[in-house]
Amino acid sequence: MTRPDLFFVPCDDAWGGHRMAYWQWGDPRSAHVVLCVHGLTRQGRDFDMLAQAIVARAGGDVRVVCPDVVGRGHSDWLREPAFYQVPFYAADMVTLVDRLHAEQPVATLDYVGTSMGGLIGLVVAGHRELPLPVPVHRLVINDVGPTLDPAALQRIGTYVGQGGRYATLREAADAMWALSSSFGPHTPEQWLELSRHMVVPASRRSADGSARLAVDATPAEPSGDPRAEPEGPLLLHYDPAIAVPFRLATPEAAAQGEAALWALYDAITAPTLLVRGAQSDLITVATAQQMAQRGPRATVVEFDGVGHAPTFVDPAQSAAVTAFLFD
């Protein structure tokens, strides 16, 4: 299986609801679900390499589900940007798991979250009142923790929501690499593939600005050859308004959020793996050490030469996750 299937799940909100897209790899009949949730400006196809590694490690008996968090990828954009926040996203994840459970009962639920996806995972795994059909069995947190370095947040804030318009996929990839070299070493081909799903042809924007594409297409892929060069101009896939709550955050709100995240982390009982880029500027060594000593006492794996955040394109990074999930 070299390409995932794309589905949509209706989610509740105060404006009549929104659709969340999700990509599914593996056996749709499997009772073992691995939910992989991406970072702030990313989308579900970030996990293509990891998903295939998980399916191979499980001998095919697994469903790997990679949503496009609302406001990204194929998912709808919210009418009220103030709700682009972790608690809202976590509610959508519960809706998604309920949908998966209704289609085929879920016996084992594992969770992998990168950056923002990891913070969502703290809520999903640590909030005892969430109506999940099954609890999180194993949790992987990728380069994030309850305490976030303010300078790193300021760095991220300089580019989130700035948009971008590119004539070619290569131009888009080069522009994104200038902002994302902390992801660590990638070949030009690997980076181009990661970038392919980060842009959408301007002609495919719907009236509200979001990407409304055919069910069997990906944002930068025309129908037919998935490696074909998309027609420009190309735009970034996400709603620029995801930056609104990010930029309105105050020091007081940040302190309250940090305390709440530590409380959630301390409530987690699932075995937890923390993957950290050794040169990460978002999660410090001190925070990683705290996460190893309290709450679920995470096992910490670091990758040298990588900052924020590991992409799991490197086989060694994927192997760390599959070993944790299956050994």
Language-model regions, residue ranges each:
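Short beta-to-alpha linker loops that shape the active-site pocket of alpha/beta-hydrolase fold enzymes
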Residues: D68-G73, G145, D304-G307
